[in-house]
Every structure is written in structure tokens, then in C-alpha cells.
Amino acid sequence: MPRYLAKAAALFVLPGCFGPGSILLTQQSHAPGSQAVPTPEKAVSLAEEGRCRESIAGLKHAMTVTTVAAEVRKQAGVLGVRCSLAMDDREVTNEFIRALTKQFPKDPDVLFVIVHAYSDLSTRTAQDLGREAPQSIAAHKLNAEALEMQGKWEPAQHEYEAIIQKDPNVRGIHFLLGRLFLSRPDAGPEAAEHARQEFLKEITIDPSNAGAHYVLGELARRDEKCEEAILQFSEAIKFNPSFAEAYLGEGLCLVNLKKYEEAVPPLRTAERLTPGNPEVHHTLATALQRSGHKEEAEKEFSIHRSLTSGQGSESPQ
């Protein structure tokens, strides 16, 4: 099993908080269901003592009874998550997570527990993958992504390249390799061109990869090849009509080409999709101002000023 595979889904939180060692499971001599379901209070007490198998049915029941005090239901849900993870019953864990999310959607303690529960579930699933199919493309991909997130660029690149060597036409890997070239700080001056070649290979394999089209558009735009960039942004939008950044990129190119009226529709769409993006409002304001819509332009400049809150924004001359 690749060394970093088990860490892939647990990079931002502490893994293993609810692992099998976190709660001692009391072995039961009786068959399941041979006792009545304990009351919510009794179930909580049993779970706190580590008697998870005895308590789990009562904890589940407590979450469904509206007459049970909210604090007891919350405690039952949290203990239910911990117990079910200790028992490695992932289906029940997800049931408790759903119940907690529905009943206590903004409670910070609940959200904290859910974050760690998802981390634990992700780690266990990654371990399943490494155990069941350690040489699969999926396992190598997960390992590469984990290495990349840790800033271990060279090993990650080798993982992606090994996948491509194994199957040159696998979808998504050329895109990930291209993204890595653009992300690594030590990639050198040829990184953008290496990345561009990978994105071109990706859209040859998978023409519907909107992300690859978008990055190709951005690379062309930064090289001041706006006509080429617009074609790529249009392809990205075709395959992902909610791709706000692609609409913005198209609008920026049209403004650079002084096609101000043509720039307004994609920028309006970008504004609708990402109303909190200051760059969208400033670019739209510029297009409106230079196409003669002074009043609308000033409104957009005003929104931009409010979003940047004192950073200093000026209307173009």
C-alpha cells in the first residue's frame, strides 16, 4: 500500500479522533435485541461508560423523539457518532451525522464532531482502497493528490506520470498533472508550457473537461492571446454553464479587445453567479462605462468599492 495513501482524506483535521481505541467496546454475551431499548438518558449513560453495543439503539431512538430535551438529543447524537465509529458501523455513523446536521445545523460543537467524523470516515475509506486495490489507478491518484496537498511535488508528479504510463488515455490525470506544474513553486520558467501541453492532451482525451478548457483560456489570456482565450472560455461554458470564472475570463478578454457591448452579457452572468466577486463588478463597470451606460457603470463601481472596503478602487480614465 502506498505510504501516504491513508492520509489522503485527512490533511486538514486530526485523523483518528474517533478510532476504535477512543471508546472501549464492552462485549455483550446476550444476542442483539434481547433487551428493551434503553431510555435516552440511560443510553447516554451507557455510552459514556463505553458500553456502545448496549446503548446504540437507545441513542438512535433518542434522536427521533421530539419530546426529548434538545441537549439530551445532541448528546445522544454525538455519542452515537463516536460509538458507531468505534464499532466501525459506517452506515449508522452516517445516520447520526444526518440527524445532527438536520437538528443542530449551526451548533459549533456538533459541527466539530462532524468534521472529525468525516475525516475518520475518509481515512478508513482510503485505507480500504489501499488494502483492496493498492496498484489501481484510483489508489495511485489518491496517493498523488495527498502528496500534492502536502507540497511533495516531485513524488506527486511521479505518481501522476506512472498512471499515465500505465494508461495514457485515462481521464483527468493530464489535467491534474498540468495543475501540479502550475502549482509547484519550483517548477521553473517552462512550467506554463508544460502545463499547457498536459491540458491539451486532456481535452483530446476528454473534450468535455471544462476545467482544462478554462485553464487553457487563462494561459492564453495572460499571453495576450485573447481570441484564442475566448474560444477556450466558450468551450468551458458550454460544458459547465455555471462556470463563473469562465464568464469573467471571456468578459475580460472582450474588454481588452475593446468589444465593450459584447463583454456585458458574460459579465452579467458572472455577476449573477458570483455577486461577491469585486473583479466581476469592476470589469462590468468598465464595459458599461465604455459602452455609454454611465449610470449602470457607476452602480457597479459603487458595489466594487463597497466590496473592496477601502482598498482603493478607481474608475478607469
Tell where the protein language model's regions lie, with residue ranges.
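Structural signature of tandem alpha-helical TPR/SEL1-like repeats
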Residues: 54, 86-95, 118-128, 151-162, ...
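TPR/TPR-like (Sel1-like) alpha-helical repeat modules
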Residues: 115-119, 269-312
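N-terminal leader/linker segments that initiate helical-solenoid repeat arrays
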Residues: 22-71, 75, 309, 315-317
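Structural marker of alpha-solenoid helical repeat scaffolds
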Residues: 65, 69, 103, 132, ...
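Helix-start (N-cap) detector for alpha-helical repeat units in TPR-like alpha-solenoids
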Residues: 36, 70, 74, 108, ...
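Bacterial N-terminal signal peptides
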Residues: 8-20
